[in-house]
Amino acid sequence: MAAGHGHEHGHEHGHGHGKMELPDYRQWKIEGTPLETVQKKLAARGLRDPWARNEAWRYMGGFAGNITFPSVILKGFKWGFAAFVVALGAEYFLDSQNGDKKHH
């Protein structure tokens, strides 16, 4: 195969694949999270978890909310109820259209 016709590794082919930008690792802090307690307990035994920071994202931002039984049960209720109302309206509308045809 001639040069430039195959999929050579390391070259961009215009598909929008560029270098992926990773977030700065220093933004993730374990201070004030349950991971800090784990690190302290490990330190008391002379140990340390060097990868704890990789789990810190779980305790920050939108991921940090408490999970409760009602939140699990009601998750998606708003969109589910909206879909139910749309389906009910469509069913009512289609039934009324068919009802008109039956009487004529």
UniProtKB/Swiss-Prot annotation:
Compartments where found: Mitochondrion inner membrane
One Pfam short name: NDUF_B12
Sequence segments annotated as region (Disordered): 1-20
Record's keyword annotation contains Translocase: no
Modified-residue entries (N6-acetyllysine), positions: K29, K40
Pros-methylhistidine: modified positions: H11, H13, H15
Subunit record text: Complex I is composed of 45 different subunits.
Protein's job: Accessory subunit of the mitochondrial membrane respiratory chain NADH dehydrogenase (Complex I), that is believed not to be involved in catalysis. Complex I functions in the transfer of electrons from NADH to the respiratory chain. The immediate electron acceptor for the enzyme is believed to be ubiquinone.
Protein name per UniProt: NADH dehydrogenase [ubiquinone] 1 beta subcomplex subunit 3
Underlying gene: Ndufb3
